């Protein structure tokens, strides 16, 4: 059981165009983005957790 929650951050392990893989909390999970694409190795933030995947966006530098 993968523990991923809204607000968690991770890093893309493949390009999201708009679907791909993201590493969050040490787990590789299927993710999608509402952006056009996010390249591999980019920090992302979890917006929504669904049954089979998560919705992410680029993490804004603070």
List the predicted regions and their residue ranges.
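Terminal membrane-proximal soluble interaction domains of membrane-associated proteins
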Residues: 1-62
